[in-house]
Amino acid sequence: MFGQQQQQQPPPPAASAYLNHNSRWTPPNESAQPRRSSNAMDINAITDRDPAEGHPRSNHTSSSIGSPIDKSPETYPGHEENGRIYHGFRRGIYFLPCDDLEQDRLDIFHKVITVARVSDALIYSPHPRNGRFLDLGCGTGIWAIDVAQKYPDAFVVGVDLSPIQPLNSPRNCDFYAPFDFESPWALGEDSWDLIHMQLGCGSVVSWPSLYRRIFAHLRPGAWFEQVEIDFEPRCDDRSLEGLALHHWYQCLKQATEEAMRPLAHNPRETIRHLQEAGFTEIDHQIVGLPLNPWHQDEHEKTVARWYNLAICESIETFSLAPFTRFFGWPVDRIKRLVADVRSEAFNKDIHAYNILHIYQARKPISN
């Protein structure tokens, strides 16, 4: 059975990395049903989210945080590009869309991460049950909502470029969007018990700068948790060169590097940047994510079914903006490549996988 590996150093090279052990914008309807907790998602029957009970807004909010979620299309109208809707605020800096398809994709990746970690824990670092938790790039808000429901005495804030979060979230959960976490914050330094970030690669120009800002906003002794996926396809029993999977990733890596927000993840650099920002007690775990259910272990097969759904929903989404903006490719060419990559992702004779990286880093009690 594949298992998790805890380590202080980055993982070994790719060959041995898989250890035995994700027009104008019309805003969502304010009366729309909220997204259901990830625990309720079923890989055998993905259905519309059930409505959940709404709550009055929290009164925990600090006046220093800023304006709450703004779903007015006149404020920062989204724009259509290649048939998808992209954010209007800071237009063009982020390569992923913000429409309904993207929101479902983000929730599926949240489920992938939960299943892969073999635990229903949402926070792995030490934390007070009544703490202040900040989620950077919260997307649909699914992690923040799950945390708020699990810890009703906590105060949870999610921030994101796009106002795609539900308005009737739990009373102890607030969202602030549009919000660019690469711009100066007004979130209160030395005031957060945990800061969380999930799948941030592809949205950050300067990780050292972001880590310094995160460090400044944590209370002494508090923790930062980051979850990333290295989307470079790997295979331990054959070369992937010459396959569409390999070609697609290399093109995606190049395009996002040209955009100054690389999707590629480098664990050695991540640990070094965290250390340079002042973090200590840095823990790094890696988990293999099979692209399809080729593995014999039943748990790995379950992870693979979820991840196959997630990655097949992501290939075209990842490709459209980078390949049209930076390579000038026509959409038809992109769709042909996407079809080839999906076919290989479904092929159980290709034992390909990606790597999930999980980091925990602590701000020292005394600097």
UniProtKB/Swiss-Prot annotation:
One GO CC term on file: nucleus
EC number(s) from the headed UniProt entry: 2.1.1.-
Cross-referenced Gene3D superfamilies: Vaccinia Virus protein VP39
Ranges of biased composition (kind: Basic and acidic residues): 47-56, 71-82
Chief subcellular location: nucleus
Polar residues bias locations: 19-41
Keywords recorded for this protein, A-Z: Methyltransferase, Nucleus, S-adenosyl-L-methionine, Sporulation, Transcription, Transcription regulation, Transferase
SUPFAM superfamilies reported for this sequence: S-adenosyl-L-methionine-dependent methyltransferases (SSF53335)
Factors inducing expression: Alternative splicing of the pre-mRNA occurs in the 5'-untranslated region (5'-UTR). The shorter mRNA is constitutive transcript at all growth stages and different carbon or nitrogen sources, but the glutamate and NaNO(3) as main nitrogen source can up-regulate the longer mRNA form. The longer mRNA is probably not translated.
CDD domains recorded: AdoMet_MTases (cd02440)
Record field: catalytic activity: L-methionyl-[protein] + S-adenosyl-L-methionine = S-methyl-L-methionyl-[protein] + S-adenosyl-L-homocysteine
GO biological process annotation, one example: sporulation resulting in formation of a cellular spore
Gene Ontology molecular function: methyltransferase activity
UniProt subcellular location: Nucleus
Disruption outcome: Decreases synthesis of monacolin K.
Enzyme class, broadest EC rank: transferase
Chain segments carrying region Disordered: 1-82
InterPro entries hit by this protein: SAM-dependent_MTases_sf
Protein role: Methyltransferase that performs automethylation. No other methyl-accepting substrate has been identified yet. Component of the velvet transcription factor complex that acts as a global regulator for secondary metabolite gene expression. Controls the expression of the monacolin K gene clusters. Also regulates pigmentation.
Subunit structure: Component of the heterotrimeric velvet complex composed of laeA, veA and velB; VeA acting as a bridging protein between laeA and velB.
Family recorded in the similarity comment: Belongs to the methyltransferase superfamily. LaeA methyltransferase family.
This protein's name: Secondary metabolism regulator laeA
